[in-house]
Curated annotation (Swiss-Prot):
Gene label: panB
Cofactor note: Binds 1 Mg(2+) ion per subunit.
Location (main, coarse): cytoplasm
Pfam annotation, one family: Pantoate_transf
Gene3D superfamilies the record matches: Phosphoenolpyruvate-binding domains
Source organism superkingdom: Bacteria
HAMAP family cross-referenced by the UniProt entry: PanB
Gene Ontology annotations of biological process type: pantothenate biosynthetic process
Identification of the protein by name: 3-methyl-2-oxobutanoate hydroxymethyltransferase
Cofactors (names): Mg(2+)
Reaction catalyzed: 3-methyl-2-oxobutanoate + (6R)-5,10-methylene-5,6,7,8-tetrahydrofolate + H2O = 2-dehydropantoate + (6S)-5,6,7,8-tetrahydrofolate
GO molecular function terms attached to this record: 3-methyl-2-oxobutanoate hydroxymethyltransferase activity; magnesium ion binding
EC number: 2.1.2.11
Pathway: Cofactor biosynthesis; (R)-pantothenate biosynthesis; (R)-pantoate from 3-methyl-2-oxobutanoate: step 1/2
Length: 270
């Protein structure tokens, strides 16, 4: 498993960091086998594997359940778990209790929190010994306000994002995810910050990249964002399922090769 210090060294040495968002045991096993640096269990699991309309419906219990499965599948990969909507911003005591619960019960290496307004939360968690990854730019828990579109597209917003990035680093964030922002802005932030900056829809000059397992493999994807590249095609599984269905209906499956041939009924009826 790469440690946080080793991930930091990758940034210093200008070696790119790979991150994949995964949600269950089998996908985690594949990600670890591919030697990906980091796995993120994102609250996007709400839409991707639970069928919710948005990330807002995801609960702490959902995150713990899936992250524990991912950890079992990838025991040797740096693991980050999302803090879901409603699990932060109530009060300091409640927020910390949930942070400890997520961090402790999942065996994650860090938690991830969305938004520039959480600097005090980052400080509080850091003081407790919980590493926090910040997420700026397009933050899915706030799409009801900002929408699914590129962020920081004008001068004022770009300046604000730079200030926010510095602020979360100063608060103690160990890493930053930048989503859906202009590539030159992401490059500037990556260059100026000391912590690793992982981009998604933020160009190639960030310290690393993250994509969702299902997106990059075209696995039950209903909408593909502009910044997603398809590296494989799991949709062919539908063809396999259709073939299975047809062979069952046609009494072609199971065949002799898939059948236990020992004759037992004569013995049973004796």
């Amino acid at each position: 498993m790469k440690t946080l210090n080793q991930l930091q060294d990758l940034k210093v040495n200008k070696e790119k960091i790979s991150m994949v968002t995964a949600y269950d045991y089998p996908s985690a096993k594949q990600v670890e086998a591919a030697d990906i640096d980091i796995i993120l269990v994102g609250d996007s699991l709400g839409m991707t594997v639970l069928g919710y309309d948005s990330t807002v419906q995801v609960t702490v219990a959902d995150m713990i359940h899936h992250t524990k499965a991912v950890r079992r599948g990838a025991p040797n990969t740096y693991l980050i778990v999302d803090v879901p909507f409603g699990a932060v911003g109530v009060n300091d005591q409640y927020d910390l209790e949930i942070a400890v619960k997520l961090y402790k019960e999942t065996d994650a290496n860090a938690i991830k929190a969305e938004g520039a307004h959480l600097t005090q939360y980052i400080k509080n968690c850091s003081n407790m010994g919980i590493p926090v990854v910040s997420h700026l730019g397009l933050t899915p828990q706030s799409v009801g306000i900002m929408g699914y579109k590129m962020q920081a597209g004008n001068k004022e917003a770009a300046r604000q994002l730079i200030e926010d990035a510095y602020a979360v680093q100063q608060a103690g964030a160990v890493m930053l995810v930048l989503e859906a922002v202009p590539s030159d802005l992401a490059a500037e932030i990556s260059d100026k910050l000391d912590i690793p900056v992982i981009g998604i829809g933020a160009g190639k000059e960030t310290d690393g990249q993250v994509l969702v397992y299902h997106d990059l493999l075209n696995y039950a994807v209903e909408h593909r964002a502009k910044f997603v590249k398809q590296f494989g095609d799991f949709s062919v599984g539908i063809d396999a399922l259709k073939q299975y269905n047809n062979e069952v209906k046609a009494e072609q499956f199971p065949g002799e090769a898939h059948t236990y041939k020992k004759q037992i009924m004569n013995e049973v009826t004796e």
